[in-house]
From Swiss-Prot:
Pfam families: APH. This is Homoserine kinase. GO terms for biological process: threonine biosynthetic process. The gene is thrB. Disulfide bonds: none annotated. Pathway: Amino-acid biosynthesis; L-threonine biosynthesis; L-threonine from L-aspartate: step 4/5. It catalyses: L-homoserine + ATP = O-phospho-L-homoserine + ADP + H(+). GO terms for molecular function: ATP binding; homoserine kinase activity. Keywords: Amino-acid biosynthesis, ATP-binding, Kinase, Nucleotide-binding, Threonine biosynthesis, Transferase. The keyword Nucleotide-binding applies. It comes from Brucella anthropi (strain ATCC 49188 / DSM 6882 / CCUG 24695 / JCM 21032 / LMG 3331 / NBRC 15819 / NCTC 12168 / Alc 37) (Ochrobactrum anthropi). Its EC number is 2.7.1.39. Belongs to the pseudomonas-type ThrB family.
Length: 326
């Protein structure tokens, strides 16, 4: 979450007249994240999250995102739910941006995830994949293989200023992925951004997932690969196989991976790493100074890509044989 667009109390008060959520008592911007502008609202009825959708978010995608949250909640998955406006819709406009309010999810994200947290995330992700199986809307992943080279071309000219030799490395990785990207794997609704700051815990119990604004219809095992990148590396960028095994064990206890999915995991993990390297690199070079947003270092994912290049089998990530189904 982040803040790109400032709002004042007068315009916020007018916007809230369209909702039945009580009277505003306070609000504050949320700095974490990189995509939209988010505010924590406190009203006489409780706490809520207000999101103003910035230019990267297509207004036409909002029914998918908000409808997905409603669908998953109806299937028992803990996640924020859109608040319905007085006119029966869930999307309004504030400060010239499309805007929505969702319920506040109790819990905290884990800055130092444990093995147990990783297993819970794997299990929760599998439950989300199953819960989304009958969701009727579809959305193309706008940050997958076909999108990576155009995104790379926006940063290529300055990439070596971030890391000498990065152009050569990235070109080789993209060529490899374009040649080896798997096809015909099981598809469905994926979160696509399930980092630790998008997963809340109450104590050691997973209390829910947030921030579904990259969710889309894509390869389910790619979502697992995103989580391996996000949850199973240490601060020194070394891969923690124990955490990886726990995450994969949690996932496969609910939804076993097919043999084809398991075989594809090293390529999917490398692809997931380059996806986040590319968006971080673009933001690192282009996010305007003064924005109330935390820029994230693309080099974290350059180092993870270097690790994935050495991996040949899913077992090296910690996938146990009994976790894979034919």
């Amino acid at each position: 979450m982040a803040v790109y667009t400032d709002i004042n109390e007068i315009e916020l008060g007018a916007f809230l007249q369209q909702y039945d959520i009580g009277t505003l008592t306070s609000y504050k911007g949320i700095a974490e994240g990189v995509e939209n502008s988010n505010y924590l609202l406190h009203t006489t009825s409780g706490s809520f999250i207000l999101t103003l959708y910035e230019k990267r978010t297509n207004r036409e995608d909002l029914p998918f995102f908000l409808g997905l949250m409603q669908h998953l909640a109806s299937r028992g998955l803990e996640c924020p739910q859109p608040v319905v406006r007085r006119d029966g819709t869930t999307i309004g406009e504030l400060a010239g941006r499309p805007a929505a309010i969702v319920t506040f999810l109790e819990g905290m994200w884990m800055r130092r995830p444990t093995v147990e947290h990783c297993e819970a995330v794997g299990e929760g992700l599998a439950h989300m994949h199953l819960a989304g199986a009958d969701f009727s809307l579809r959305r193309r992943n706008g940050l997958t293989l076909a999108d990576w080279r155009p995104l790379w071309n926006l940063s290529r000219g300055r990439a070596d200023t971030v890391e000498p030799g990065l152009v050569r490395e990235a070109e080789a990785d993209l060529a490899f992925l374009e040649k080896n990207w798997p096809a015909d794997l099981p598809q469905g609704v994926i979160h696509a951004d399930l980092f630790p700051d998008n997963v809340f815990f109450l104590g050691d119990r997973l209390s829910g997932f947030i921030d579904f604004y990259f969710a889309c219809t894509d390869t389910l095992a790619y979502d697992v690969a995103v989580c391996l990148n996000a949850w199973c590396f240490e601060k020194d960028f070394s891969y923690n196989r124990t955490k990886g095994a726990a995450l994969l064990r949690g996932y496969t206890s609910v939804r076993p991976l097919s043999a084809a999915e398991a075989d594809a995991l090293p390529v999917l993990a490398r692809g997931a790493a380059i996806r986040f390297m590319l968006t971080r690199l673009y933001d690192w070079l282009n996010v305007p100074e003064g924005s109330f947003v935390v820029k994230k270092d693309p080099m974290e994912y350059v180092r993870k890509i270097r690790f994935h290049r050495q991996i040949e089998t899913a077992a090296e990530y910690g996938l146990e044989q009994q976790g894979a189904a034919a």
